[in-house]
Amino acid sequence: MCGCASGEDAMETRRPLHPLLLFFSPWLLLLLLLVVQGVRSLQFTRDDFPDGFTFGAGTAAFQYEGAAAEDGRTPSIWDTYAHSWRNPGGETGDVACDGYHKYKEDVMLMNETGLEAYRFTISWSRLIPSGRGAVNPKGLQFYNSMINELVKAGIQIHAVLYHIDLPQSLQDEYGGWVSPKVVDDFAAYADVCFREFGDRVAHWTTSIEPNVMAQSGYDDGYLPPNRCSYPFGRSNCTLGNSTVEPYLFIHHTLLAHASAVRLYREKHQAAQKGVVGMNIYSMWFYPLTESTEDIAATERVKDFMYGWILHPLVFGDYPETMKKAAGSRLPLFSDYESELVTNAFDFIGLNHYTSNYVSDNSNAVKAPLQDVTDDISSLFWASKNSTPTREFLPGTSLDPRGLELALEYLQEKYGNLLFYIQENGSGSNATLDDVGRIDCLTQYIAATLRSIRNGANVKGYCVWSFMDQYEMFGDYKAHFGIVAVDFGSEELTRQPRRSARWYSDFLKNNAVIKVDDGSVSTAFHAQL
């Protein structure tokens, strides 16, 4: 999660040049103008983004909807986790923002803010309580009604099919994502969503951050479904195998995703004219030193962070780095599966917050028993002076240059992919006068524009999140919303923060944003 240094609003009008410049020769004046505009600052408005680019904000079903046991919804693996002793904060998503009952007023608030797009997730266990089979009419009614409200408001809809909320019934029946049985069940669930909502939803994302959930849910067991094995798990897992299950989870996620994409293309795309993509978590990584070992470790980390998902989707197989590291523990694609996953996407969604430094830890591969962390054989540093860890650090440092470098890397490595920035924001400021969040969003929106001007094919940007909601890390104490929610009030009162008014001014009034080009990235590297 990114934290941002405080400062004044980045909105301001264009200032006139100093009169003394008029005394310089035309050539020198031109040079000075280039320095001012190209190096020291960047000024832009909403209109500087390409046609078809959309700005929005997001929420997620478990974190927003509440009504956990209402109108036929059954528990998901996230419900089970939230109600267990493994949940360090003890809070649950039983009520959350009560979006299940308050979505109409929330859509009105989105419209007032000027959102052009809204990214939300669908609860599988609300729509199909048993995980397969009969559709819950109440769940269907809820999503149809919310989608209709968004359509009436003229807000582009970006729907996500899965976000850490597998129906618990499927987890109990066959182990969920570690079983190949989940592939057909997910495709059938996706088909219901495409059929019922696809006449109004044109942007579909199958899964959020599987590259992170593999390690957190199936290696160290920290997140749902809390599977791990000794000696790797952080928690006292009773089920799991940290050496192989992260790889099985990703393998079946890719096959489920690709099956849903093929189904959409064969049954729905011609009539609905929508697109389907997958989301990945996308930190950027710098080598800790210029040593050959640290540089190689950084490239290895990128293969695990990005290539684990993108290499199969683009080339039909896992990166050679992963094959060498994991050996027989990494599943093989059959010829049919390789053909199925290759090019099985129309876009890639990126969740981007911060950057890490990386150093080599090749001694990890000498362990008699290895997990994914050992296979990566690297250490992660939030700063050059921090204590390193074996797993990447979400961090609190702002590094918009990292987003630019990530997009540049992905374009060079995997071709001219179409991207949506589906999450970016800050959870560090609970006040209504959240100037720090404005600074954060300003810098990352500017980085997005710079990337586009440098050739990246980015079509949208979503703030995380539209309103405060239940968070996996921090429960209700993390405040990512540009709209504040008073979780202590019975009405769960919403109140736009200063960042919401700033975002609205940018989107509705084409307000000018001025950014000191690179200044925040410079500060990031200075503190490291």
From Swiss-Prot:
List of residues binding a beta-D-glucoside: 63, 163, 353, 423, 464, 480
Keyword Disulfide bond assigned: yes
Disulfide bonds: 228-237
Biological process according to GO: carbohydrate metabolic process
Its EC number(s): 3.2.1.21
Glycosylation site list: 236, 241, 424, 429
Enzyme class: hydrolase
Catalytic activity: Hydrolysis of terminal, non-reducing beta-D-glucosyl residues with release of beta-D-glucose
SUPFAM superfamilies for this protein: (Trans)glycosidases
Signal peptide: 1-41
A GO molecular-function annotation: beta-D-fucosidase activity
Superkingdom of origin organism: Eukaryota
Keywords from the named record: Disulfide bond, Glycoprotein, Glycosidase, Hydrolase, Signal
Cited Pfam families: Glyco_hydro_1
Keyword Protease set for record: no
Annotated active site: 209 (proton donor), 423 (nucleophile)
Family of this protein: Belongs to the glycosyl hydrolase 1 family.
Full protein name: Beta-glucosidase 19
